[in-house]
């Protein structure tokens, strides 16, 4: 499970690339670095692919998330599939097509869950999947 910088690092590990600075590299009307807002605040909406771990977790294709990043996925790494994106097309989630426990999100559920308990389900799902592999 990768979160924010881990999301970006995981993509690079699988051969993907990043936009180094969203404001300079990509035209967008959406705020991706919500530095002036409380960190738990929902900053923008995302769409979730129905055929994804994230959809299994949230049971919804629409979700609002916080946002604290100035880098973003440009080219997706090999063996990864996009599972969530913001309205401007920036990737917000992906998962591996080859490794069932490799998945990642760009937002910060670890900050949001105190205010939005459904965000805790990301961690519950990760623990459940990991625990099932321990013998």
Mark where each language-model region is:
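Cysteine-nucleophile active-site neighborhood
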Residues: 1-37
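Amide-donor transfer/coupling interface in amidating biosynthetic enzymes
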Residues: 23-135
């Amino acid at each position: 499970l990768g979160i924010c910088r881990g999301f970006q690092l995981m993509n690079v590990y699988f051969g993907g690339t990043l936009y180094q600075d969203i404001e300079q590299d990509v035209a967008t009307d959406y705020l991706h670095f919500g530095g002036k807002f409380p960190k738990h605040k929902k900053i923008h909406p995302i769409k979730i692919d129905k055929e994804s771990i994230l959809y299994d977790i949230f049971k919804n294709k629409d979700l609002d998330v916080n946002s604290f990043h100035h880098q973003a996925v440009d080219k997706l790494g090999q063996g990864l599939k996009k599972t969530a994106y913001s309205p401007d097309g920036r990737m917000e989630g992906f998962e591996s097509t080859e490794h069932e426990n490799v998945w990642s999100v760009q937002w910060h559920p670890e900050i949001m869950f105190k205010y939005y308990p459904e965000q805790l389900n990301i961690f519950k799902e990760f623990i459940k999947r990991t625990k099932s592999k321990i013998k």
